[in-house]
Each structure stands twice: as structure tokens, then as C-alpha cells.
Amino acid sequence: MCRKKKHIGFCAILVVFVCNAVFLSCADEGEIPNDPISNSPSVSGQYTTVAGQLLKNDEAIQLKGVNCLQTYGLTDAELMNAWGIEISREFIGNLREQPIDGGAIEASDGVWYHPLQQIVNRNRANNRVTILCPFGWVNANGERQLLTGLNPTAQDFYQDYKDKMQRIAEHFKNQQDVWIEVWNEPYHWDNENGYSHVLWLADMEDMVDNLREVDGFESIVIVPGNEQGQSEAALLTHGKDLMRGRYNLLFDLHAYEKWLLDSTESSLITRIEAIQTAGIPFIMGEVGVQNVGDVMPVQHFLNAARATRLTTLAWVWNQNSEDNNALLTNNGEANATAQNNFWGTTYRAFLED
């Protein structure tokens, strides 16, 4: 989760890092994006997306899971098993230096990072799907820029980002239970800073095609929505355009203020079903009880996700009694108090249902 605020996005993981976003001029609505590639194989494999659905072995599925911070160290797999966690979205806070395989490294920011393959191996051994998602970029001076709220192709590190993402795709191309998300929560929370749906389409085409240029990489690629990941407007406007000539795309939305506030279970079911009916395969890659304001209600959303069989992942699997979004206390119990709307036990009940 990266918190949404006017003109600023920030995320408190280990330390608070301030984002100084660089916003450049972007495509206007009149521009025509590049033609989609057409190298789609016949869609097959363990995990696929077909006709707006997420499938496992050709059967529609709903997965329930969490966002994890295992790049900082592996978590207790048995505890995750006890909660019934089926999918883990892994936080990559230092994409440039993140080790893919081998051993842990101490990076330029002074933080130790554990290799992605080690995380995947642990998840796989416990029958969990892994989503690898870049959340931040650390430069040679050890300064981190979080990706949330940014226009991807406007960043000065964008080509280096593409190169690293291709290396990740190359390494995991024969591991179908590893899905790659192109970017965490892009674009301004209120569609400012030069945003347009045409820009979203052009950027997503470029980032998706960058991964598909890796020979043999056919696994699921995850594409975020606009408004820092909370809006489906871009998906409904240009999702089918992005899907044309491409395969195994899965879209990712995040449920915070724009979903949890001023909504009911019924209205959320209608909203979710509108996306599903449009033939747009999507997951709710994050849901949490707090973002930039007060603690929010969440039970109505979980009820709607259950009713629509929407794959859903909580923010966040972490042992921190002081963090309202952490599912666990410091000692590994469910973090559930009146202060956080009993988030730990509420989400565990959703997982076990």
C-alpha cells in the first residue's frame, strides 16, 4: 500500500521515504497509441486469463491472499498456511538492486534484500502463487523514489527499469506460478499531472510488451488501474484495447477510500460485476483499513468480494501492533482491536470462509 495524498504519495515501510515526483508533459487524448503486438501463442498452462476470467487448469478460480515484505526477510510459512493464504504479492522496494537469485545483498540504501527466487521457492513449497511487484527505485546514492503516483515513462530511470524487468522475466519465464506486475499504483490520485487514459494505454502497452519481448515468457502480467491504482476508468475505457493481440493480462485495482467510503455491499457488487461483465479480468491487489485518513469500514467490501468471487489480497502481512493495516501483532497473533476495526480477525475470517 502506498498512501494517497494530494500531490504526494508515500509509504511507511521500515522508514518513511518522501517521494519527489518528476512530472513531465504527456500524451493528449488525441494521440493514437502504438499498434498492439500480435505474438500471442495459444493460451495454455496452469494459470491463464481467458474471456475476462482468471483460470487455473482451465477452471475459474478465486484466490485469497496478502501483500508481503519478504524481500526484507522470509516470513513464517506455517503461520501463513494456518491463515489459508493462497497468493502473495511481494513488495520490491529497490528494483534496481533487488537480487533475483543467489544470496541476500546489502544495497546502497543500507538495507539487506533477499533474492526473489528464494521467496518464490518458499511460496511454491506452500502452494502459494507469487506476484512480483516493483514499488520503488533506489539510485546510486541510496535515495529511494517510490513508484506510486508517478507517470512511468516520464521517469529518468525508465529505461533502466525496463532492463531490470526483462531480467526478472527472463529468470522466471518457465515458472507459471510467478506473475509479474508492471508498476505499483501509477498516476496522480485525481488524474492530474498530465494524466489521460491514452497515456495509460501507451504506457501499459510499452511495459507489457517489454516483458513479452523476453522469448518464452508467457506467464500472467498484471496491469494496474489509474488514480494510484484505485480507479477502473482506464480499464473500462482502454482495457480491451490493451488486451487486443496480447494474452494472459490480469488487471489490478486497490480498495481504499474510493471503494470503502460512501459505498454499500450492494453498490460494490454492482461495481465489481460491471468490470467482470465487460470482460476485464481483474483482482483487488490491495485492501486495507487505513490510508491517509481515519480507519475505514471494510466488511462490506469483503462481503462483495466473496459474492463476486473476486481474487483479493490484504495490505499487509506484517507483525506490527502499531500499524492498523498490519494483520499481525508483534508476537504473531491477529492484530484486531477496536482501533483498526478488528482487521486481523476480520480478514482471517474472509480467508477461511
Where in the sequence are the language-model features?
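C-terminal motif of bacterial Sec signal peptides marking the signal peptidase cleavage site
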Residues: 22-25
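Aromatic-lined substrate-binding rim segments of carbohydrate-active enzymes
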Residues: 74-142, 149, 153-163, 167, ...
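Extracellular glycoside hydrolase catalytic/binding regions
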Residues: 43-48, 63-65, 70-74, 149-153, ...
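A short acidic, helix-capping loop that chelates divalent metal ions and anchors anionic groups
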Residues: 96-100, 140-143, 188-192, 323-325
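N-terminal carbohydrate-binding accessory modules
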Residues: 31-89, 97, 103-106, 342, ...
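Bacterial signal peptide processing site
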Residues: 27-29
